[in-house]
């Protein structure tokens, strides 16, 4: 902002004498400050976003209500922006958080690169075992091995696969590692017990993702770990019989070409089909 309201400027400048004068003049710390047309924050909220520990204590000591915030509960903001000392100040807010907000608390730790806050959250009842699956999958997807290892050690579900806005297809962490061609991560997850047979809602599993990415080394590694019958043509024919696929379609999926071109279309120029042996059935779930 080019200019800040007087109270916000005093907080950002850590101008204690100015704030004391404003308080003597009747400043109410529980009234939000309009920072722009669409943004307003509580005074304490500004201090938490700035991780200004002395200012946070000053405002609390002068009556700021820790339960008031415009963006989200201050425990979540502190988990992202501050250290354990500040997170502990708002730990009692755990009691009013929804399960989704508790999941977000672990995500805030990931976004803010504040793994040191996990212990405080756990002590407050926001355990990684119960609420850390979403953050674990995201950490794996972005290749953050250190955080993924920490969350797994704390009890995160290695096979967590609920859908969310980032992962609407409900993949597992190991499927995401395969999608990003992260062979070391895939190996590590499997060593830790990841289930490579769990498919997302479109039928993709780590092996099929590796094949789609033309990552032969990863595909070969995963294929060797899957049930042999999943890669047997006769077994696939048996599995697909209830679907009554036309014989010509089955033959086409065996021989290709699997890439269909639509050069005259404006929006969709091509589509790529699954090969016959990659077709997903409920038997392979």
Report residues per predicted region.
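Conserved small/polar residues in nucleotide/adenosyl-binding loops
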Residues: 280-284
